[in-house]
A protein has these predicted regions:
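Structural microenvironment flanking redox-active thiols in thiol-disulfide oxidoreductases
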Residues: 66-105, 113-122
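Thiol/selenol-based redox catalytic cores and closely related redox-interacting motifs
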Residues: 116-195
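Bacterial Sec-dependent signal peptides at the C-terminal "C-region" and cleavage site
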Residues: 19-31
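Bacterial N-terminal signal peptides that target proteins for export
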Residues: 2-16
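Short, thiol/selenol-centered motifs that function as redox-active sites or metal-ligating centers
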Residues: 59-70, 131, 188-191, 197
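Short active-site neighborhood of thiol/selenol oxidoreductases, capturing the structured segment around
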Residues: 47-66, 169
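A short beta-strand-turn-helix
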Residues: 32-53
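Structural recognition of the beta-strand scaffold that forms the well-ordered cores
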Residues: 55-56, 86-90, 110-112, 143
Length: 197
């Protein structure tokens, strides 16, 4: 597994944002095919009657992300019955590492392996943990923190004062626009894939 350096959130570069919006306009993201840890190929953004899709960008070794595991499982449970599909997205882990992580942290959602960062590029996600809410048409409706419990690296509140992801999901499910579409996620930087020279 590649080490993932811990850094505060940095806004995605203009190039990534432009590429993400170009992909959205072309609808390319909906046909993304990725492997689950068990090897099955899935299309995490394909519309199958759900009202929204949530992508949780995670790594196995990010302390902030691991602290969020119970809340991620609660969100998955609370919104699944309301028509929301959720996936954990891992960029640099092996299938075995992801399976172990899901079990050890009792994360109750499906996972996909994304070594080429296709979903991160598509959505603009740059850190873990970061959440993205997408419409059935593949439009990013929300991207950012799960809540405001992580204030900065090394500073975490006991309880959040704003539950951003839940607010976004509630708005989407009520047919209303998301008020705060982008928030600053705090966590571990998603490093680009290593290339062989």
């Amino acid at each position: 597994m590649n080490a993932t350096p811990s850094r505060a959130f940095v806004a995605p570069s203009t190039g990534i944002v432009i590429a993400a919006f170009a992909a959205l306009a072309a609808g390319d993201g909906l046909a993304l095919r990725l492997n689950e840890p068990a090897g099955r190929v899935v299309e995490p953004l394909a519309a199958r009657g759900q009202k929204a899709t949530v992508l949780f960008f995670l790594t196995t070794d990010c302390p902030i992300g691991n602290r969020y595991a119970p809340e991620i499982s609660r969100i998955v449970r609370d919104y699944q019955a309301r028509g929301v599909t959720s996936h954990a997205v891992y960029a640099h882990e092996t299938a075995a590492e992801v399976t172990t992580h899901l079990r050890e942290y009792q994360l109750s959602l499906g996972a996909v392996l994304d070594p080429e960062l296709k979903l991160a590029k598509f959505t603009g996600a740059t850190v873990t943990p970061e959440a993205c809410v997408l419409s059935p048409a593949g439009v990013v409706l929300y991207r950012g923190r799960i809540d405001d419990r992580a204030v900065k690296l090394g500073t975490v509140r006991l309880e959040p004062t704003v539950r951003d992801l839940r607010l976004a999901l509630d708005a989407v499910l009520a047919g209303k626009p998301v008020v705060e579409k982008f928030t600053q996620a705090i966590g571990c930087y998603i490093s680009p894939p290593e290339t062989s020279d």
